[in-house]
Amino acid sequence: MIYKSKFSIPFLIITILIITGCSNSVSIDEKKVFRYNEHSNISSLDPIYSSTLRNIWPVNQIFNGLVQLDDSLKIKPDLAKSWIISKNGLEYKFVIKNKIFFHYSKTFGKDSTRAVNAGDFEYSFKRLNDPQLGSPGSWAMKNVNSFKAENDSVFVIKLKKPFAAFLGLLSMKYFSAVPYEAVNFYGDKFGKNPIGTGPFKFKRWEENIKLVLRKNNIYFEKDNLGKNLPYLEAISVTFLPDKKSEFMEFAQNKIDFINSIDSSFKDKLISIDGNLKEEHSKKIKLISGPYLNTEYIGFYLGDKKSQVHSKKLRLAINYAIDRKKMMKYLRNNIGYAANNGFVPLGLNMENSVNGFRYNLKKAKTLIKEYKAENNKEKIELVLTSDANYLDIVEFIQRELQKIDIDLSINIVPASALRQGKSNGKFEMFRASWIADYPESENYLSLFYSKNLAPNGPNYTHFKNVEYDMLFESTYQEQNSVLRKRLYKKLDSLVIENSPIIPLYYDKVMRFTQKNVEGLTTNPVNQLNLKKVYKK
């Protein structure tokens, strides 16, 4: 006979203690609470400090901006219902939606609220641009000449020079609307007491223990059937400090979702073709898709005496690496072999740039020519990386042995790697680029000669007059089809000149419990919970 616990049936009505001055408990159906762990902790819930995913995810639940991205990275209205861009690309005029309200808060009076207006964006932009506040997102304001609320409904931004990707830039959470009343009330504690317009409102945050968000009952968005969003009643975030503990919580059904997994569990869950193993499919789900992150090896071209200054040598190295084999055996195909350009899948879904395919014969021919032209008998290079990518760089080391290159590996702390590549210290270095905003220009800026490190992201010190002219022309091209053609030409020039070795384009890997519905993935790895529910 099988006995069932008397506590197993009521679908686990859990009790969350909401601390509001005095302790009182509110019972919430467990199926209405979405639980996840943030192993990196959260530093602030103030949008102007949302520079990392750990901050961006909760901020995205609490705040809204002028525009937002859908899962295919198309610009959609958020608090702005419409906008007009001037013909010269310098002026953006936004019309703000009516009757959108901030979360109820004592900062507006006793448990009160007020509607968002254009003045809130003027105030929020000033905060982002205030050097005394030290926002890591202040760089996004460098091309902004002025911004002003013309009235309660119209907000105008004027740029110093045209920038066709500006709407994508505005989708970042830095540009969220915050109420001046709340900032004045909480001062520098606003980041721990956030007030926004988002689908969830702040309830409680015990640092290193738990963050609780509750449903915003006056949220303005509805689903396709006219039902109010969000569906969930609460979000509960824990802060276990390592991915292994996080995975164990997930395995015990104590959290609903994990973003990627610790490498030690990779082979247990993921097959060699990158899919969830059949034996786990009855208990959990895997949602995956392209991630705007390109992993690569950079060549420092600032030293003309260096061997890697030879384009022929760089091409040979690129042809000598079997990226598909690397992805299959080292990463279980979690990601996509970078056999095309530098711009990753997600922005370049057509995959139309012809990149490097494994061609050992061609690589050997190029090396033979390089040795003859430079009177070289032996080629010795040094590749610098941090320890997290040791398996990748050792694979490259073995591949280059096949073309008679002696590659030494220099492992340094991540901080030393960042500093060294900025200062031109390493002839070859492992790096990655995650998009700040969803535009190919963000990747291609790494090869613009006016962006030389340490003052910009051009760590390779690649310089090319044709490239610079094409890159500058993208700023003014408002036609997205024509702009994509320019991006393709630029990406092709990167491959042709090979200042880098594209390794792979990353992939978002989201694991959920079987009863989680409505969670999607997107190339910027944003967490959108307003349409999520649990069966």
Feature locations, PLM:
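N-terminal lobe/hinge region of extracytoplasmic solute-binding protein
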Residues: 37-87, 126, 195
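Alpha-helical secondary-structure segments
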Residues: 117-122, 152-156, 198-199, 229-234, ...
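Ligand-site clamp/hinge motif
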Residues: 191, 219-272, 406-408
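Structural transition elements
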Residues: 200, 337-370, 385-391
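Extracytoplasmic/peripheral linker and loop segments enriched in polar/acidic and small residues
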Residues: 315, 327-330, 406-417, 445-513, ...
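Ligand/substrate-recognition segments at binding pockets and active sites
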Residues: 335-336, 368-435, 508
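Long beta-strand-rich cores associated with HINT superfamily self-processing modules
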Residues: 510-535
